[in-house]
């Protein structure tokens, strides 16, 4: 009879290995819905939350009460009231977390009543910004085209002025050449006239000298 009792006691102890069977120590929270407890009662920054995390069940039965350590474990086990106290603290923490989430959502909504209204307002703002940017781009393209047209007209005007100056210079050059040709012709005519007059003067001089010699003889 002793051997079966030992087997059942070992089985129940094995089942209770994953549950807390000691007193309630000071607790710490990481800001979420989870609660952690400091085993040594002194919270430090290097305490590992995974090692401090404990599991509670709402039950009035005592855990691991068989065997020689039954009395000590019964003194250290949590009562139903204590477990409800722990659950109440967890609910309070959950309420604080939900309140923080609600405040975060209200900050995100920026005064709007719902995400739908907030998204509609954001979409309107984005649409207005897009319309303004599209309008600005259209005005910029129009100014760019006007600048290109003005540059084209100015370039065309410069080309016309240059061609006009070139035609005028060509006409002046032609006129100058014509004048120079005319002057050359006049110069040749004048030279021919002077030579002709020189020839006539030479002949008259010879005739005069011959006539004077005959009279003297």
From Swiss-Prot:
This protein's GO CC annotations: endoplasmic reticulum; extracellular region; Golgi apparatus
InterPro entries, alphabetized: Fibin
A UniProt-annotated Pfam family: Fibin
Keywords on record: Disulfide bond, Endoplasmic reticulum, Glycoprotein, Golgi apparatus, Secreted, Signal
Signal peptide positions on this chain: 1-18
Entry's localization field: Secreted; Golgi apparatus; Endoplasmic reticulum
Protein name: Fin bud initiation factor homolog
Lineage of origin: Eukaryota, Metazoa, Chordata, Craniata, Vertebrata
Gene: Fibin
